[in-house]
A protein has these predicted regions:
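Kelch-like beta-propeller repeat domains
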Residues: 2-8, 12-14, 21-25, 35-396
Length: 396
């Protein structure tokens, strides 16, 4: 568990986020501090990432939910259940910086497979599906958790990717589910006034791609182009290696492709790097542990591999760490992964304590110094404890 030090500022206790000490005329960051208690050194401060524990569970167990942050809250919205029923929920759970859970206004439409991102003072929950119906709904929450709606997506779809660049949130790709899946290439951009603009589409149809931001670009990578009735991400043919970037004027360009085809991977930004981790390669039929990095000039390199090959993982950036948690690596109960890897700004990897339950289809959100990983599915064969309401908390 990470430790903290507080100092008094204007009669209030303020958490010290960073500490430095002078060595040879150079400021060196302090990673840990100890104090003597009863003749023993006790850790009182740590700037390193660690597992904090668990928070109050979600108000209802579910998978394929979406998470993001607005104001003083981490939000987890929507989600659903098994691939037969494909049932969606409208629940919105909110956690404050003390990890106290409240329930905010429900989504306007119950759905799973939706996408969420923060833009300015708004949290956007976009798209999704319920049964065989896809939605273009855009629910918007402000810092007081008041919900409004914005103009719908140009095409109703689920499993899209999101990224922010400049004053825009972009939603790219996805799939439209109306009894049969139709993969999409559409890209919709919303500005801070929540006005929608439809921009140049992806170079090809893609769902289960990953979106993130680096430098002055919103970047979308990989995904799956197959039109299919399948609901299992990444277990069919069709993964791709495209990388498409949009600048703050919404001009699109192609970047160096991924080193291999991947779908169901996850993206997180740390420092000047956008990390793309895990996924499934349909050409080799393998789950992936590789991690690719794009810098601000969109030059590609590689980072240390994940501790486990997997797709369907979640990611979050908290403090000076990008974390990748959970996932799935095969068709059995034992294939649900609990590993959590953290990368610092130097791309050094630390393997964290495991999630309390191995699972995929979980969502992430950050509040203060905490990264929360919530929900998911943990079994495929058994009907007991199949869906999860657990919220694992990591600190940095």
């Amino acid at each position: 568990m990470a430790k903290a030090v507080y100092v008094g500022v204007d009669s209030k206790a303020r958490k010290m986020k960073k500490a430095y000490i002078g060595i040879g005329g150079t400021a060196r960051k302090v990673k840990k501090m100890y104090i003597g208690v009863g003749g023993k050194a006790r850790l009182c401060y740590s700037a390193e990432a660690d597992k904090f524990g668990t928070a109050t569970p979600l108000s209802k167990y579910r998978t394929l939910l979406a998470g993001t942050t607005v104001g003083g809250y981490a939000l987890f919205g929507g989600g659903g259940y098994d691939s037969d029923a494909r049932k969606g929920e409208a629940i919105m759970d909110a956690y404050n910086a003390s990890l106290t859970r409240t329930t905010a206004a429900s989504l306007s439409v119950a759905r799973q497979g939706l996408t969420a991102i923060t833009l300015g003072n708004h949290a956007l929950f976009v798209g999704g599906r319920n049964g065989d119906t896809s939605f273009g709904t855009v629910d918007v929450y402000d810092a007081s958790l008041t919900r409004t709606t914005a103009t719908e997506l140009s095409v109703g779809r689920c499993n899209s990717a999101a990224a922010v660049v400049g004053s825009y949130a972009l939603f790219a790709g996805g799939r439209k589910c109306d009894f049969f899946t139709l993969t999409q290439s559409a890209v919709d951009a919303y500005n801070t006034s929540l006005t929608r603009t439809t921009v140049t589409p992806l170079p090809r149809d893609s769902y289960a791609c990953a979106g993130g931001t680096v430098g002055g670009y919103a970047v979308f990578s990989g995904g799956n182009y197959m039109n299919t009735a399948s609901t299992i991400i990444g277990t069919i043919l069709g993964s791709i290696n495209m990388v498409c970037a949009y600048d703050s004027s919404l001009t699109s360009s192609r970047a160096e492709p991924l080193s291999c085809k991947r779908t169901g991977h996850s993206a997180a930004t740390i420092g000047n790097h956008l990390l793309l981790a895990g996924g499934y390669n349909s050409t080799t039929g393998k789950y992936l542990s590789t991690v690719e990095s794009y810098d601000a000039s969109l030059t590609r390199s590689t980072a240390v591999e994940l501790s486990s090959a997997k797709n369907g993982l979640a990611s979050a950036t908290v403090g000076e760490y990008a974390m990748f948690a959970g996932g799935y690596k095969g068709n059995s109960d034992a294939a649900y992964v609990a590993t959590v890897d953290a990368y610092n700004t130097a791309l050094t990897k630390t393997t964290m304590p495991d999630l309390s339950v191995g699972r995929y289809g979980l969502a992430s959100a950050v509040i203060g110094d905490y990264a929360l990983f919530a929900g998911g599915i943990s079994k495929i064969q058994s009907t007991v404890d199949k869906y999860q309401d657990v919220v694992d908390v990591y600190s940095a």
